[in-house]
Amino acid sequence: METSQITETINMVSEEHLDIRTVTMGISLLDTVAGTPQETAKNIYHKITTYAKNLVAVAQQIEREFGIPITNKRISVTPIALIAGKATPDDMLYYAHALDDAAKAVGVDFIGGYSALVQKGFANGDLALIKSMPRALTETDLVMSSVNIGSSKAGINLDAVKLMGETIKAITDKSDTANAKLVVFANAVEDNPFMAGAFHGVTEADVVINVGVSGPGVVKRALEKVKGEPIQIVAETVKKTAFKITRVGQMVGALAAERLGVEFGIVDLSLAPTPARGDSVAEVLEEIGLEMVGTHGTTAALMLLNDAVKKGGVMASQRVGGLSGAFIPVSEDAGMIDAVEAGILSLAKLEAMTSVCSVGLDMIAVPGDTEATTISAMIADEAAIGVQNNKTTAVRILPTNGTKVGDMVDYGGLLGTAPVMPVVPKSSADFINRGGHIPAPIHSFKN
């Protein structure tokens, strides 16, 4: 390598917040099913602790060798509803606690996969899992949960949309922060390394390593060098920068998989912000030319950013997957928080932005008295964008008891701080209460 390249890499880490956001081990639990929930839970704990016992140590060793921070070490597992069978909501708690205990035993930050896939309908295990969520997410510390309620092939399960609005409200009654551990998807992917939506799909190998990279600060610094240039130069600069960022993820992921003796899965190309200044997707958009994120032109700038990240990253990794785009979580992005507080960034604008990026209405605080049907309607709107446009969309909404619009809610750590945002005061109840199933779009019929 040339001296300039070495210096550039050092600066990306030390000054521009480049990190490996997560090394996530995906583990299949399909072979853990036993005669009783208690036996299955015991098998779940044993398999996770067997395969993941060295995950944290290996990640830390790679950090020391290469000087590249690995912010999170995580686990994803088979959607638990798929192995639940005839379990009751109370039975599901054995599985939730087994996941939590295993995650703590091996020292990871989070474990994802307390999940259900209900885009076409409910099986018993799906309903049992969803009904158990208020207890499961408040009685555990590290368990992350997701529910897929729609897909471009199946349409949208409006009964599930309604149930998830009610479930989110029920969780709020027990905890103001537990909903940060739950995401509702359309077109969920099977190899996502990011939380809270990670689960290990049934088409995956038994155990794999997936990596999520992050570098909004690196992209921002690169764009500072092309101020005033035509927009195609901006796109080209982002592509080249994304290539460099992704090569780091490819190297770390392949090395971690080799040392752990498991398969290497994918690199997720997502630009994932943190609450730290200089590590913000909003600041990247503003560097492209917006006075503040949320103003007119934001959606176009985000489309360019998202597309250029994918184009640059695809060439840098042998396998790209996950969500791969730009994340716009309000509470986890200092620039987004500023824009909401200034009254520039609204829920309506955020919804528009989700049509061109990963992944959806994410980490958004709303007043605690927001109706369950209103939350369901927000989920339905996001699902519609994903289903119609054949992309992943999601909602991670945080109703917070005792808050009003403008209050700040602190979720701690990487989850950050969110200003409470207003929702439209008119009701969507009659629409949501219809229930049933929104058919798949006409372009879903491809055979």
From Swiss-Prot:
Instruction: Enumerate the InterPro entries for this protein.
Output: UPF0210
Tree of life domain: Bacteria
> Its quaternary structure?
Homodimer.
Q: What NCBIfam families does the database record attribute to this sequence?
A: PRK05313.1 (NF003700)
HAMAP family in the record, alphabetically?
Answer: UPF0210
Q: Which family does it belong to?
A: Belongs to the UPF0210 family.
| Name of the molecule in the record | UPF0210 protein LCK_00974
